[in-house]
């Protein structure tokens, strides 16, 4: 994946920043899902922004099943609660795979232009793009929502991203 923001909002192009600010103004996962009441967006958009899965050699890009890092890269007492993705590729025809938190329930969601995807993050929220449309790059806009946690809770969480291309879906 390319274009992932690690440098702060001043490095995001103005039109993209306007769209991201609009989404966080009106999209509140606490109200929509009711699973948390304390998730907030990181307005520096660390780990978010424009993301692209490139189409290498006209064979299609690939983003295997993975769990994102749960702890924020610069605010070590922030835990990722939700990932929100906006589909930006109009002609892309594939799916977004999601394993629910117990690691057993599988969902396949069609990737659509201008569709907003959101899911609750955990150490077992596996997701990826195993089927890629050949000849096209997949572009998304990503925004992460976080909660504040104690040092003790942070120390009990596996902090690094995990990858597994051998997950089987029933």
Predicted feature locations:
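Fe(II)/2-oxoglutarate oxygenase catalytic core
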Residues: 1-118, 123-170
